[in-house]
Amino acid sequence: MQNETDVIKNFDQELNIEWEDKVMEPRMYRVILHNDHYTTMDFVVQILMTIFHKPAAQATRIMLDVHRKGQGVCGVYTYDIASTKIAQVHFMARQNEYPLRCSMDEV
């Protein structure tokens, strides 16, 4: 009696299939907050602490980058996580009537 691995090998050989064992790392994306003239600094810090789980000091530093440089990097994530975090930022901003924008760009 053949074990499962042998059965799969024989099946693959009959169909002339070659398998490659290549594991690729997922693409990573930077999540970026953009400055505007209406969103308060306190709200940006709250977003960074709530959604991105940043400690207060780091959240404040990122908020100051957003304020002074026009944008700040919140973190680097896989596509699905980055998309979810962006949607959460936009939802929370909308709920609080702020025009805060967030985007991602591939690392």
From Swiss-Prot:
GO terms for biological process: protein catabolic process; proteolysis. SUPFAM superfamilies: ClpS-like (SSF54736). Gene3D superfamilies: 3.30.1390.10. Involved in the modulation of the specificity of the ClpAP-mediated ATP-dependent protein degradation. NCBIfam families: PRK00033.1-5. Belongs to the ClpS family. Binds to the N-terminal domain of the chaperone ClpA. HAMAP family: ClpS. This is ATP-dependent Clp protease adapter protein ClpS. It comes from Syntrophus aciditrophicus (strain SB).
